[in-house]
Amino acid sequence: MPIPPELALTSEQLDELMLTSWNMRIASMGPGTRINLTPLWFGWAGGNIYTYCRGQKIANLRRNPVATVLVDRNERFPELQGAMFQGRAVVLEDSDAEAADPNMEAVRTQMGSKYAGGHGESAEPRRNESTARGRHWRWVRFEPSRVVTWDNKKIKPRG
């Protein structure tokens, strides 16, 4: 059953969710038929989701770029807000691919500010300088083709 449009996040609410939430979860297809679900730090720019990761996630996305990303917040049902993105992941294989991405500089600055201080405020936000290295450390740009959002705070009480 689809989520009624009146319960969806506005574009401003979606941006706020994506810019302030700490983790996303990405589901990719592992070897065979197993789904690999992993929490990761992320950036949001140009309607795309960016993350820097390694290992099985990169191997999975190279093999099959179809993935789903979930970003949500709050624990109690009446307060749940979130967004599910279905789409395709693009592994940025080298520094040239990173430099060619029009959002990469904004994402590096955003993620540096967001995560530089761990779970507290960073004394001095710094840019995320991570780049492709070795066989599996890569930036990934997730390009959504379908977005579903919800804001349970908008559900009217029965009665």
Cite the ranges covered by each PLM segment.
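Short beta-strand segments
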Residues: 21-54, 69-72, 81
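Alpha-helix boundary recognition
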Residues: 18-19, 59-63, 133
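Short, basic/aromatic recognition patches
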Residues: 2-25
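Short, solvent-exposed aromatic-acidic interface loops
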Residues: 54-57, 111-112
